[in-house]
Amino acid sequence: MERNLRKTRVGRVVSDKMDKTITVLVEDFVRHPLYGKAVKRTKKFKAHDEMNECRIGDRVRIMETKPLSKDKRWRLVQIVEKAK
């Protein structure tokens, strides 16, 4: 299986309370089909953080993976920017 075909997202960590799991908020701007206004859509993903290295506020890149639990289908690829 090619790893290149897996989706990646960049988002902000909003929760790190679970062991080896983070919650990542991904924001996306889409144009309304009729009115053309840019609308912000947000979605939360649970991602696997093997080393428990992420903290709230970090910008991270996550990648699709096989299902790891009931809700977890993403894994941490890299920390783009640490929280200030």
Curated annotation (Swiss-Prot):
Stored Pfam families: Ribosomal_S17
Entry keyword set: Ribonucleoprotein, Ribosomal protein, RNA-binding, rRNA-binding
Region forming the signal peptide: none
InterPro entries to which the protein is assigned, alphabetical: NA-bd_OB-fold, Ribosomal_uS17, Ribosomal_uS17_bact/chlr, Ribosomal_uS17_CS
Biological process per Gene Ontology, one example term: translation
Any one Gene Ontology cellular component term annotated for this protein: cytosolic small ribosomal subunit
One GO MF term attached to the UniProt entry: rRNA binding
Quaternary structure, from the entry: Part of the 30S ribosomal subunit.
Function: One of the primary rRNA binding proteins, it binds specifically to the 5'-end of 16S ribosomal RNA.
HAMAP family for the chain: Ribosomal_uS17_B
Similarity section: Belongs to the universal ribosomal protein uS17 family.
Protein name: Small ribosomal subunit protein uS17
Originating organism: Alkaliphilus oremlandii (strain OhILAs)
